């Protein structure tokens, strides 16, 4: 059995689309039927951004803003966990230690954020490392990695293959790791996938029904190789 971690962008939940959850459940079942063991990490999305914005406007400190974002991501994790029903272990871990313990039960484990100052991308990299997963799939609202945001710049082309060093260059000077902007791995997540030689696949969550083909390299996505 092959272990993989699926990081689901918070934008997946912003769409309020029940079909997203139905397709996600079907995709997880298909992965299990094809010999994959899956862990899932959820982002906080607009729920996190809304609470963070309100709290910041009344002067709440950054550590507490991080906690609001973490709890929003965990709310999304509960939604996914409940939608998976018997496929999932019925507990959302709040730390890496809890994730490892839950993972030992043999079912899908769904988690959100862990601690302030740490993105859910970094959490996904950490749990990939802890579960001995050699592939981390990042499902977001674009088809892969671009040099610039494809939703703003119509002429940019998808980069099908790149290294973590290439990704660092793309991220240099950008604001793409801030809430509400084009999402890629943050520097901490990159360091983790490099040290454990974890391959990263960036895909569009609207193509989750093709995830087996994406893992085989037969569908549009970006593959990031650790170096």
Curated annotation (Swiss-Prot):
| Stated pH dependence | Optimum pH is 7.0.
User: Where are the bilayer-spanning segments?
Assistant: none
Q: Name one GO molecular function term.
A: ATP binding
Report activity regulation: Unlike most bacteria, is not activated by GTP. UTP acts as a competitive inhibitor against both substrates. High concentration of UMP abolishes the inhibition of UTP at low ATP concentrations, indicating that UTP binds to the acceptor site (UMP site).
Q: Which UniProt keywords apply?
A: ATP-binding, Cytoplasm, Kinase, Nucleotide-binding, Pyrimidine biosynthesis, Transferase
The protein's location, in the record's own words, is: Cytoplasm
EC supergroup of this enzyme: transferase
Q: Where does ATP bind?
A: 7-11, 45, 49, 140-141, 146, 149
Q: Name one GO cellular component term.
A: cytoplasm
Q: EC?
A: 2.7.4.22
Q: Which GO terms describe its biological process?
A: 'de novo' CTP biosynthetic process; UDP biosynthetic process
Describe the reaction catalysed, as an equation.
UMP + ATP = UDP + ADP
Q: In which pathway does it act?
A: Pyrimidine metabolism; CTP biosynthesis via de novo pathway; UDP from UMP (UMPK route): step 1/1
Would the keyword Transferase be found if you checked this record's keyword annotation? Answer: yes
A Pfam match: AA_kinase
Residues reported in the UniProt entry to bind UMP? 44, 66, 114-120
Q: Which residues form a coiled coil?
A: none
- Spell out the family assignment given in the record's similarity comment: Belongs to the UMP kinase family.
Purpose of the protein: Catalyzes the reversible phosphorylation of UMP to UDP, with ATP as the most efficient phosphate donor. Is also able to phosphorylate dUMP, although much less efficiently.
Q: Please tell me what else the database record remarks about this protein.
A: Catalysis proceeds by a sequential bi-bi reaction mechanism of random order.
| NCBIfam families on file | pyrH_arch
Q: How does it assemble?
A: Homohexamer.
Write down what this protein is called: Uridylate kinase
Q: Which organism is it from?
A: Saccharolobus solfataricus (strain ATCC 35092 / DSM 1617 / JCM 11322 / P2) (Sulfolobus solfataricus)
């Amino acid at each position: 059995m092959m272990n993989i971690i699926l990081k689901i962008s918070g934008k997946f939940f912003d769409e309020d689309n029940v079909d997203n959850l139905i397709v996600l459940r079907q995709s997880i079942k298909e992965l299990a039927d094809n010999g994959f063991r899956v862990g899932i990490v959820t982002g906080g999305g607009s729920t996190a951004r809304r609470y963070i914005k309100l709290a910041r406007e009344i002067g709440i400190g950054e550590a507490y803003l991080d906690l609001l974002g973490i709890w929003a991501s965990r709310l999304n994790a509960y939604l996914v966990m409940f939608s998976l029903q018997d496929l999932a272990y019925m507990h959302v871990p709040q730390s890496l230690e809890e994730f490892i313990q839950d993972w030992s039960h043999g079912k899908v484990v769904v988690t959100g954020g862990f601690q302030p100052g740490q993105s859910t991308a970094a959490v996904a990299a950490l749990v990939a490392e802890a579960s001995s997963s050699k592939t981390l799939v990042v499902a977001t609202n674009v088809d892969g990695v671009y040099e610039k945001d494809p939703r703003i710049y119509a002429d940019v082309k998808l980069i099908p293959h790149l290294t973590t060093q290439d990704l660092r260059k793309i991220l240099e000077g950008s604001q793409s790791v801030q809430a509400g902007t084009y999402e890629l791995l943050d520097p901490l997540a990159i360091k983790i996938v490099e040290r454990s030689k974890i391959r990263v696949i960036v895909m569009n969550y609207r193509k989750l029904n093709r995830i087996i083909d994406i893992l085989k390299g037969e569908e549009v996505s970006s593959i990031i190789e650790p170096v």
